[in-house]
Swiss-Prot record:
This is Cobyric acid synthase. It comes from the Bacteria. It comes from Salmonella dublin (strain CT_02021853). Pathway: Cofactor biosynthesis; adenosylcobalamin biosynthesis. The keyword Ribosomal protein does not apply. The keyword Iron-sulfur does not apply. GO terms for biological process: cobalamin biosynthetic process.
Amino acid sequence: MTQAVMLQGTASDVGKSVLAAGLCRIFYQDGLRTAPFKSQNMALNSGITSDGKEMGRAQIFQAEAAGITPDVRMNPVLLKPTSDRQAQVVLMGKVATNMDAVSYHDYKPRLREQILAVYNSLAQEYDVIVLEGAGSPAEINLRDRDIVNMGMAEMAQCPVILVADIDRGGVFAAIYGTLALLHKQERDRVKGVIINKFRGDVALLYSGIEQIESLTGVPVLGVMPWLDVDLEDEDGVALQNDKYRGNAPRDITIAIVQLPHISNFTDFNALAAQPDVRIRYIRRPEALTDADLVILPGSKNTLSDLAWLRESGMADALLQTHRQGVPVMGICGGYQMLGDTIVDEVESGLGTQPGLGLLNTITRFAQDKITTQVNATMSGELPSWLAAAAGLPVRGYEIHMGETVLQEGCCTAMTLQKNGCSVADGAVTADGLAFGTYLHGLFDSDAFTRAVVNGLRARKGLAPWETTFCYAEHKARQFDLLAEAMRQHIDIDKIYTIMQQHQEPV
């Protein structure tokens, strides 16, 4: 029988995704066929499987930690917020509809059977399933139709480990309060607690751990220290962390505009890992002053975010920075914003709107979403700071619902290989100061990233770095460091025992 364990949290951003990835790595190292699973994920960071299905980035990097190819069954329901009240509902990797929160809450019971079937299908192929919940299981207003926390644990008939974040304070109240709000049968599923993100002398916690174990009857399986590992963050709230504030001195500073509906900020993890690059996420015009490159990232609501750029003063500041000779790059929604015109009768219903005008392009939104992995080749001749990237192979993925047409004065940035055909993508101006593409994950291509960074170095009179940084090897090292730390600070043998003793037939 397949064994399973589920990580649930006392709140969002307590570290469930990273610890789930660590368990996947540990079980993989121990020779077990392991897969991650999250029944419902709400995130703007998504990726594309090899068969063109869209799923949450967290389950993609957890699958990588487990040494397996990402499979959309690992995240059958993906919710992508389009506004404060609505989200795009993606089922088994394809867009189903848009719903508001109330409509989706009413819709959830219809998903239970499909989710259970998908879970059972996955479980038949693996020795261990590492499940992840969402937010907190103590959301008592959502309990009756829950499909992602205790509702999912019940479907999988698996034990639960509760993760609590001590860094934000009040960890013992969070543990006690969460368990107190659960029904008895739900509480009985919780077989252990992990205290996460601790800084300092763990001996200071011992008396508190003894008391919380006595009060709840649930053992604390370990205290994880705050780890300096470079792994993907799932939630936009993570952009508030020190990791993204870019205070460390580096040769090259890249400013990424933190749009209100930013999506796929994981595009920039490989860029941030470069030894000579400082990444800063910015929301204020004055923060553009020292940038060597400005990037407009993807957006789940392009025209709304374009309006925010204008209202906040960021658009004027960005155009002024561009006039001063600083290159500006756009990815997906950011690429669309850089153009002259956006015609949207689909996403926002705002019709025809002017873009920023840095690229002479016209974008028209469409109903059908393009979701595919692609190989590409950069154009044979590229100007200025992009010149060293000319002709290089790159790989990435597309997630968009629009088509962009180049007008006079723009050149194609790259050629994609799709279904045996060559397809033009992206645009670049003759001076290289404006560059856009639909390709997410572009910076995961090591040679391209080093060429781009060296081009920026040359603009500052700095010598190029001859060594190319391998991001795939870097990620593998981070997974191993995480697994090593978890083995040191968490009772992994106890987790094995919990899985063996408390897994029930589904």
